[in-house]
Amino acid sequence: MSRVAKAPVVVPAGVDVKVNGQVITIKGKNGELTRTLNDAVEVKHADNALTFGPRDGYVDGWAQAGTARALLNSMVIGVTEGFTKKLQLVGVGYRAAVKGDVVNLALGFSHPVEHKLPAGITAECPTQTEIVLKGADKQVIGQVAADLRAYRRPEPYKGKGVRYADEVVRTKEAKKK
C-alpha cells in the first residue's frame, strides 16, 4: 500500500490550483502547468493543500494516487522555484553556445549540432563547456538534457562526451599488448 499518497501537497501562497475533474492546472510565478491524472485517483483541494486517494473499483488506486501526488508536488515546486539541470562537455574542441532558443554544439562532427529548445525551457552557458537548463516542468528539463547528452554520450575509455554535472563516468583500462 502506498504511503506517498497519504501525505498532502502543500500549496504555497501565490500558487493557483484548479481541479477540473481529472485535469489539474497549477499556475505560479514561473508559468502554468497542466496534467491529466489517471481515472483511479481522486484529488481534493482544500485549505491550501491537495489530498489524494483511490476511487472505488480500481485495483491500483493507491499506487496511482502515490504517482499523482509525486507528479503534482513536482509541478508545485516547478512553478514556484523551478528546476535546473547542468551538463558538461568533456573533450578537446567540444564547445557549446546558446543563441535565443537554440543550443549550438561543436562535438567533433563534421557539422555543428543545433538543438531547438521547447517552449518554457531556457539555456545558458556560463563557460564554453557547460550548459545550464532551467524551466518549470521537471520532465521536459530531463528530456532536453537527455537529448543533448545523446548527441555524444561519454565514452568509457577517455570519458569524452556530454555528461550530467553530477554523473560519474567509469573508465575502462586500455587493451594491453
UniProtKB/Swiss-Prot annotation:
Keywords, ordered alphabetically: Ribonucleoprotein, Ribosomal protein, RNA-binding, rRNA-binding
Highest taxon above the source species: Bacteria
Ribonucleoprotein in keyword set: yes
InterPro entries xrefs: Ribosomal_uL6-like, Ribosomal_uL6-like_a/b-dom_sf, Ribosomal_uL6_a/b-dom, Ribosomal_uL6_bac-type, Ribosomal_uL6_CS
Entries under Pfam families matching the protein: Ribosomal_L6
GO function term, MF aspect, one: structural constituent of ribosome
Gene Ontology biological process terms from the UniProt entry: cytoplasmic translation
Gene3D superfamilies in UniProt: Ribosomal protein L6, alpha-beta domain
GO CC terms of this entry: cytosolic large ribosomal subunit
Transmembrane helix as UniProt keyword: no
Family: Belongs to the universal ribosomal protein uL6 family.
Subunit organization: Part of the 50S ribosomal subunit.
Role according to the record: This protein binds to the 23S rRNA, and is important in its secondary structure. It is located near the subunit interface in the base of the L7/L12 stalk, and near the tRNA binding site of the peptidyltransferase center.
Name this protein carries in UniProt: Large ribosomal subunit protein uL6
Taxon lineage: Bacteria, Pseudomonadati, Pseudomonadota, Gammaproteobacteria, Enterobacterales
This protein's encoding gene: rplF
